[in-house]
């Protein structure tokens, strides 16, 4: 989804949950829920794994 793409880009930039929440205008709890769903969708368990997956699968291009 568009939101998940935004999250991956922000994770790649090294932003914290609080920084992501501030930038998107949502609560930190909502960020955590989005990340949990993203990790589940990608089959990963961490921010680092999510960024690695995104880079390897061309999700950060364009």
Language-model-detected regions and their locations in the chain:
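Short helix-coil-helix linker/hinge
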Residues: 1-3
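Pre-recognition alpha-helix immediately N-terminal to the DNA-recognition helix
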Residues: 5-9, 49
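Short, locally clustered residues in the helix-turn-helix/winged-helix DNA-binding domain
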Residues: 9-13, 55
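Recognition helix of helix-turn-helix DNA-binding domains
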Residues: 14-49
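Terminal helix-turn-helix DNA-binding modules in bacterial transcription factors
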Residues: 18, 55-56
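…primarily DNA-binding HTH/wHTH and HhH modules…
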Residues: 57-62
